[in-house]
Amino acid sequence: FAEEKSVKTNWKVDEKKRIENVSPETRIETFLEMDKDLTSQGINVASRMFSFGTSLTEKYFINTEGSIISSDVPRIGAYGFITVVENGKPEQAYKQFGYAGGWEALDQWKLTEQMINEAKVLQRVIKEAKAVKPGKMDLVCGSEVAGIAAHESCGHPMEADRILGREMSQAGKSFVYPGGPFWLGTRIGSPAVTIVDDPTVKNSYGYYEYDDEGIRARPRYLYKNGVINEFLHNRETAAK
């Protein structure tokens, strides 16, 4: 394993509104009210599906090198899936939300406003959207598309165990591999593009301060100004 300093600490994510203090009745009523507001906009939202869940992850990490780390992370997640139908034509939208913290997440998400906006967009798409002529063109991508591309096409290929072949039979290999045309320092994109894996963003769903090997979290610049900059390592791959 790569050498790391031992650490003794405990950390947690605070809740401004404790999830455990919110009754099941309040949780259900919150989403029933959202559904009521959504269906009173004069838009034919033919189907709606909402899901909501909470968790509290408590971890106690200890290793033979002297590290002792305890943590408590409450998380809250929700998603909405709606179908709008106009003149017999359906369009669908899916919105997902995640937060490390307490019930205050719902105040920040503004679920009702976001789902109503999605319904209005779908209605407009059905009524006004025009087919695009085939061909090459410049596109401006929204966060939904850009996020998927960053995660799937940029994030997974930078996993060092995948790069070294450990994931090949289960989840596929990477376009980056030893002896290949792409490696650290190789330019593969525009200087305007930098992609960062950052688990230290406060209240993000994937937030953590120390990982499951006891390593302090930090932003990792996978691609910097269009250049392959660093990989996602565990202690085993970091030692190679």
Please describe what each predicted stretch is.
Residues 227-240:
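C-terminal, non-catalytic macromolecule-binding modules
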Residues 1-219, 224-227:
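Active-site bordering "gate/hinge" segments
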